[in-house]
Amino acid sequence: MQADQVLKLVRLSEKSNKLSSELGQYTFEVFKGTNKHQIAEAVEQTFKVTVKRVNVQNYRGKNKKSRTGRPSVGSDYKKAIVTLKAGDKIELV
């Protein structure tokens, strides 16, 4: 698979910034149908680094209400936490 068919975006938050600076772990939102091997290959091809481990979490969309009171559901998504080999780093702007 192409890297753009696997990786959607980089998730930046306080927790993900702490993981990247202390443990060398980076957080990505990925497409639902991808597996750990495809995610590792896409990160290695895109950022020219060596992936040590990939952890994946599936999230269900939250229940919400619109202005008119109608119930709706947010989008489901899949998150991947990628651990890099010691010494490797991804420069995120």
Swiss-Prot record:
<comment type="similarity">
    <text>Belongs to the universal ribosomal protein uL23 family.</text>
</comment>
<keyword id="KW-0687">Ribonucleoprotein</keyword>
<dbReference type="InterPro" id="IPR012678">
    <property type="entry name" value="Ribosomal_uL23/eL15/eS24_sf"/>
</dbReference>
<dbReference type="GO" id="GO:0019843">
    <property type="term" value="F:rRNA binding"/>
</dbReference>
<dbReference type="InterPro" id="IPR012677">
    <property type="entry name" value="Nucleotide-bd_a/b_plait_sf"/>
</dbReference>
<dbReference type="GO" id="GO:1990904">
    <property type="term" value="C:ribonucleoprotein complex"/>
</dbReference>
<dbReference type="Pfam" id="PF00276">
    <property type="entry name" value="Ribosomal_L23"/>
</dbReference>
<comment type="subunit">
    <text>Part of the 50S ribosomal subunit. Contacts protein L29, and trigger factor when it is bound to the ribosome.</text>
</comment>
<dbReference type="InterPro" id="IPR001014">
    <property type="entry name" value="Ribosomal_uL23_CS"/>
</dbReference>
<keyword id="KW-0699">rRNA-binding</keyword>
<comment type="function">
    <text>One of the early assembly proteins it binds 23S rRNA. One of the proteins that surrounds the polypeptide exit tunnel on the outside of the ribosome. Forms the main docking site for trigger factor binding to the ribosome.</text>
</comment>
<dbReference type="GO" id="GO:0005840">
    <property type="term" value="C:ribosome"/>
</dbReference>
<keyword id="KW-0694">RNA-binding</keyword>
<keyword id="KW-0689">Ribosomal protein</keyword>
<dbReference type="InterPro" id="IPR013025">
    <property type="entry name" value="Ribosomal_uL23-like"/>
</dbReference>
<dbReference type="GO" id="GO:0003735">
    <property type="term" value="F:structural constituent of ribosome"/>
</dbReference>
<dbReference type="GO" id="GO:0006412">
    <property type="term" value="P:translation"/>
</dbReference>
<protein>
    <recommendedName>
        <fullName>Large ribosomal subunit protein uL23</fullName>
    </recommendedName>
</protein>
